[in-house]
A protein has these predicted regions:
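Short aromatic/hydrophobic "clamp" motif used to bind/position activated sugar donors
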Residues: 141
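Short, well-formed alpha-helical segments that are part of the catalytic scaffolds
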Residues: 61-76
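Conserved catalytic core of nucleotide-sugar-dependent glycosyltransferases
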Residues: 151-237
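The conserved acidic donor/metal-binding loop of glycosyltransferases
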Residues: 145-149
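Glycine-rich, basic loop-to-helix element that forms the pyrophosphate-binding segment
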Residues: 118-135
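Acidic donor-binding segment of Leloir-type glycosyltransferases
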Residues: 72-117
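Cell-envelope/extracellular polymer assembly enzymes that use nucleotide-activated donors
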Residues: 51-55, 83, 252
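C-terminal catalytic/acceptor-binding lobe
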Residues: 2-36, 47, 68, 229-304
Length: 304
C-alpha cells in the first residue's frame, strides 16, 4: 500500500474521530499525544527580512483561489519574502490551469510553490499541512484556506509584528469578511474568465473580531512546525479519504500546541464567505442540507 492509498474502513473509526474531538476540547492533556514542545527560549527569534510561507489547499475552488493569488500580485510584500504553497490535484482542471497561469508570473517578493497531491490525500487537509510544516524552511508558516486574501499592508505589517517573536501560534485579531455570498453573486460567478487578476472592492468587507487561530488564520512559528508537524502524531488525521473531510484537526492543532494563539493587529486579512461548497458534490442532498444548516447557524449568531 503506497502512502496515499485509502485505508480500509475500521469499525472504530467513528469512535476514534469522536474521541479526538473530545480530547481537543481540553479534557485530555495534549502532551500524551505529541513530543515535548520546543521551549520558547530555544526557538529562533528571527528578525530583519523574514521568510514567510503561506500554505493553502484548493479543490474545485479555482474561482476563490484566483482572488487569493491575485492579492499577492496586487499587494506584493517588500519587507519579507513569501513562498506561496498551494496543494491541489490535477483532476481539478480549473485549478491546474489557474496555477499554470499564475506560475508564469514573476512577482517581486513572492515564490510560487505548487504541490500536487492525489485527491484522496488532498481531501484530508492535515496531510498537506503536515508535509509543508515538516519541509518548510520559513521563519513563520501561515496555514490558510483559498478564500482568504492578503490585501494592502497585510504581509509587510505581519513581517514587522513578527520581528523577534517566539510565540508558537499567532493570528489576526480582525478578519475582514464579506456577507455569505450565494453562487450567483458577481464576485463568485466569474464564468470562464478565471485567468486574469481578480479585483474586489474593499467596501465588500466588514471587520469581524477573532478570538483564536481558526483554520485559515493559523500563523505558526517555523521551529514549532518543523518539530511538531501538523497533527503529525494523530494518525487518524493523516489518513487519506475518498471524500472531503471536515477539518476538525484545526482545533486539534491548537490543542497540541497548548494555545489558542496570540492575536496581532494585521490589516488587510480579507475572506470571501460563500454559501456553495465546491468541495462537495453539486446538487447532493447532503450538500443542500449543509447549506441550510450554515444559513440557520449564521442567522442565530447574528441575532445574538
Amino acid at each position: 500500500m503506497n502512502s496515499y492509498s485509502i485505508p480500509p474502513p475500521r469499525w472504530h473509526d467513528r469512535l476514534h474521530g469522536w474521541f479526538l474531538r473530545i480530547a481537543a476540547s481540553g479534557l485530555i492533556p495534549a502532551h500524551m499525544f505529541r513530543p515535548t514542545l520546543l521551549p520558547q527560549a530555544e526557538r529562533q527569534g528571527a528578525s530583519g527580512h523574514l521568510q514567510l510561507e503561506v500554505v493553502s489547499h484548493c479543490w474545485q475552488y479555482a474561482y476563490l483561489l484566483a482572488y487569493q493569488l491575485s492579492s499577492l500580485v496586487q499587494f506584493p510584500p517588500t519587507r519579507a519574502t513569501v513562498t506561496m504553497t498551494v496543494y491541489y490535484s490535477r483532476e481539478d482542471t480549473d485549478t491546474t490551469a489557474l496555477l499554470a497561469w499564475f506560475g508564469a508570473m514573476q512577482v517581486p517578493g513572492v515564490i510560487w510553490n505548487w504541490r500536487e497531491l492525489p485527491k484522496q490525500a488532498l481531501f484530508r487537509r492535515a496531510i498537506g499541512r503536515n508535509e509543508a510544516a515538516l519541509q518548510s524552511r520559513a521563519d513563520w508558516i501561515w496555514f490558510t484556506d483559498c478564500d482568504l486574501m492578503f490585501r494592502r499592508n497585510c504581509l509587510d505589517t505581519l513581517a514587522d509584528l513578527l520581528q523577534g517573536r517566539r510565540d508558537a501560534l499567532v493570528f489576526p485579531r480582525i478578519e475582514r469578511c464579506t456577507a455569505v455570498l450565494p453562487a450567483q453573486d458577481p464576485l463568485l460567478n466569474t464564468g470562464q474568465a478565471l485567468l486574469r487578476l481578480m479585483e474586489v472592492d474593499d467596501a465588500s468587507f466588514v471587520d469581524l473580531p477573532r478570538t483564536r487561530a481558526t483554520g485559515p488564520l493559523q500563523i505558526t512559528h517555523g521551529d514549532i512546525a518543523r518539530t511538531q508537524g501538523y497533527c503529525r502524531d494523530l494518525q487518524f488525521y493523516q489518513r487519506p479519504s475518498a471524500t472531503w473531510c471536515k477539518a476538525y484537526e484545526d482545533r486539534a492543532f491548537r490543542w497540541l500546541l497548548g494555545t489558542q494563539g496570540t492575536p496581532l493587529d494585521i490589516p488587510g486579512v480579507c475572506r470571501i464567505r460563500h454559501e456553495t461548497k465546491g468541495r462537495y458534490t453539486s446538487g447532493d442532498l447532503n450538500a443542500r442540507l449543509r447549506a441550510m444548516i450554515r444559513r440557520l447557524g449564521r442567522a442565530i449568531k447574528e441575532r445574538r
